[in-house]
Amino acid sequence: MLISADAPLLIGDGVGELPCDANIPVGFNTEWEYTLQEAQIYSGTTILLFTDGLTEAMNINYELFQMDRINEVANKALAQQRIEPRELIEQMTEAVHQFVGEAEQSDDLTMMGIQFIKKTEPSA
């Protein structure tokens, strides 16, 4: 899913990038040896994955949407306490559509939001 030079966003107590090493897409090369990567993610954190179609969405002036705008939308969503994956993707979609305006879509645009919810143990 992650076909972008940019790391996925982590949105919880703040907005940051998921620390990860670059890899190639799954299935691209059957001989590729992927490295195991781990990160601590806290309950309630939303992970936003996206293709380069988001960062490279272009308006009629040939300006790109880029990470600054993605972070701006994510920070606004966090301030409004609207970081549920569906809400976050809706806000990001609206922001990119407003930015692009009447320009033709130059690339596919895919986003996926995942929210980590820690399972609580039942009371004894």
Report the location of each language-model feature.
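Conserved subregion of the PPM/PP2C metallophosphatase catalytic domain
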Residues: 1-124
